[in-house]
């Protein structure tokens, strides 16, 4: 006689069968998500709640688990996107130990072929925010990591756009490194005769002399040592140009002081800047020939009156060379031993001294800005461009062409119509706002004489925060500047190049990303 199964065993078997049925139904729904949409809303909600209660009975734990799962999913997408963005051209240039200038001239016999079209377009999983037009996008450009396809193509073409500037003369301040250096190369490769000012003329000459096409334009380049903090020197330089040059078509007021560097930052260049002239290579000496030449007749008498007191003799003869002026200690921090903050032999991508200070000008509040720095910033960013634009206008009017340009290189820090304004670096904001006001006020006057004056924002090229903070932002916030120095250079010379190529000369505007923006 067979024993009857216990009632509890039968119940277990029935429950197991029901569980297997439930699993099969859930797997069917997982394979075809549209099935759940066919359920009445009440049953669908009960199903969601039942599954959730089984997975995590506690509502708080369930919410936390859901948030954690979403965060993990986002992290996975971001890791994928980081790989895509990491492969862009602008990221590759940033990883290079030393920035090299793009060679925009193809070799002889080269035939253009767009190999990029042969590649499958790269897509991001998370929608990106375009730096220029602010629209969302997912297709990633081969060079830019923060622009939509349309903006990226436009900006990429601008990097290599040239114009025929043969026979024209351009003045560029701050043309030794970074944006100024790239702008100088662009003007030279357009055929212009270029006058460059910098505090470190020998270092500047060596940099230009290292370009592969140096021989093509070296005879059209002259470099002058000039410290824009010293207003009498700026006046004297303008007087010298008036006496030695027959024409001037373009002025690019690029030099600026954003982050003040103490003398130790520049110390590594002093040996080269103060060495005997015969120790310099011949090509470097040629670029500096006009800078070292004696002043023209009447030059000294015309500039001596610039002294605070006319009884002071030898005004310019007693002034230190511009490079040595960088070693004058003006603030208490300039006297501190700083070898650990500016380690010898450690240079950045632009072959400039590494600055390891934990705090710099970019972090200062109003009550923290030294008076010396306040004055320096105004002198370099606003006063010097004012003097240059004013004193050299007669030189610009010596020739009849009405397609001349003045570019006052500005920044969004100087913009009043801006929704968000930080409380930091008010002195640089003031200086750029003053520069913009000069453009806004005087552009019409200069336009009447065929000179087109504009302010131009370079774009976001550099993270000005101290090195440690900037490095941490890359890791923690995935922050990378959206542009590089070639983009910045293309922006500041675009009023000239676009004007010459199109015949449409913009004037009296504040230009951002090649287009007018609010003041």
Question: For each predicted feature, which ranges?
Answer:
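Active-site-adjacent segment of SDR/Rossmann-fold oxidoreductases
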Residues: 245, 441-451
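Canonical Rossmann dinucleotide-binding motif of NAD(H)/NADP(H)-dependent dehydrogenases/reductases
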Residues: 156-201
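A glycine-rich helix->loop->beta "capping" turn
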Residues: 121, 218-222, 240-253, 265, ...
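C-terminal helical subdomain
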Residues: 293-344, 472-519
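Conserved glycine-rich Rossmann-like NAD(P)H-binding loop of the short-chain dehydrogenase/reductase
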Residues: 190-208, 222, 250-255, 260-288
């Amino acid at each position: 006689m067979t024993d009857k199964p216990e009632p509890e065993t039968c119940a277990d078997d029935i429950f197991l069968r029901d569980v297997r049925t439930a699993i099969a139904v859930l797997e069917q729904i997982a394979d075809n998500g549209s099935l759940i949409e066919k359920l009445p809303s009440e049953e669908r909600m009960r199903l969601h709640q039942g599954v959730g209660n089984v997975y995590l009975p506690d509502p708080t734990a369930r919410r936390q688990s859901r948030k954690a799962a979403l965060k993990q999913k986002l992290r996975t997408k971001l890791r994928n996107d980081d790989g895509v963005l990491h492969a862009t051209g602008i990221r590759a240039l940033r990883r290079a130990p030393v920035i090299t200038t793009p060679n925009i001239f193809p070799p002889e016999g080269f035939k253009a072929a767009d190999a990029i079209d042969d590649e499958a377009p790269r897509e991001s999983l998370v929608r990106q925010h375009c730096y220029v037009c602010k629209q969302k996008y997912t297709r990633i450009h081969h060079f830019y990591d923060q622009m939509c396809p349309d903006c990226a193509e436009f900006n990429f073409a601008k990097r290599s756009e040239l114009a025929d500037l043969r026979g024209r003369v351009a003045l560029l301040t701050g043309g030794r490194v970074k944006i100024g250096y790239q702008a100088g190369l662009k003007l030279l490769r357009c055929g212009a005769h270029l006058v460059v000012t910098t505090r470190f003329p020998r270092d500047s000459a060596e940099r230009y002399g290292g370009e592969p096409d140096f021989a093509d334009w070296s005879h059209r380049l002259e470099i002058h040592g000039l410290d824009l903090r010293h207003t009498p020197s700026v006046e004297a330089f303008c007087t010298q140009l008036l006496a030695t040059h027959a024409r001037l078509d373009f002025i690019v007021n690029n030099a600026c002081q954003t982050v003040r560097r103490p003398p130790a930052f520049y110390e590594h260049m002093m040996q080269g800047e103060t060495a005997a002239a015969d120790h310099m290579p011949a090509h470097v000496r040629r670029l500096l020939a006009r800078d070292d030449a004696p002043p023209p007749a009447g030059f000294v008498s015309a500039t001596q009156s610039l002294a605070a007191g006319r009884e002071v003799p030898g005004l310019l003869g007693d002034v230190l060379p511009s490079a040595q002026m960088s070693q004058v200690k003006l603030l208490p921090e300039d006297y501190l031993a700083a070898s650990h903050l500016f380690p010898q032999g450690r240079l950045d991508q632009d072959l400039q001294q590494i600055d390891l200070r934990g705090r710099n000008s970019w972090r200062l509040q109003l009550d923290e800005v030294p008076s010396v720095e306040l004055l320096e910033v105004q002198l370099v960013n606003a006063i010097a461009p004012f003097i240059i634009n004013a004193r050299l206008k007669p030189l610009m009017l010596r020739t009849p062409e009405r397609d001349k340009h003045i570019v006052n290189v500005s920044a969004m820090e100087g913009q009043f119509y801006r929704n968000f304004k930080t409380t930091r670096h008010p002195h640089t904001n003031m200086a750029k706002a003053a520069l913009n006001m000069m453009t806004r006020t005087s552009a019409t006057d200069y336009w009447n004489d065929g000179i087109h004056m504009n302010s131009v924002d370079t774009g976001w090229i550099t993270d000005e925060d101290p090195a440690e903070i900037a490095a941490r932002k890359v890791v923690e916030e995935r922050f990378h500047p959206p542009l590089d120095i070639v983009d910045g250079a293309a922006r500041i010379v675009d009023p000239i190049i676009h004007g010459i190529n199109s015949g449409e000369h913009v004037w009296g505007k504040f230009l951002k990303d090649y287009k007018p923006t609010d003041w």
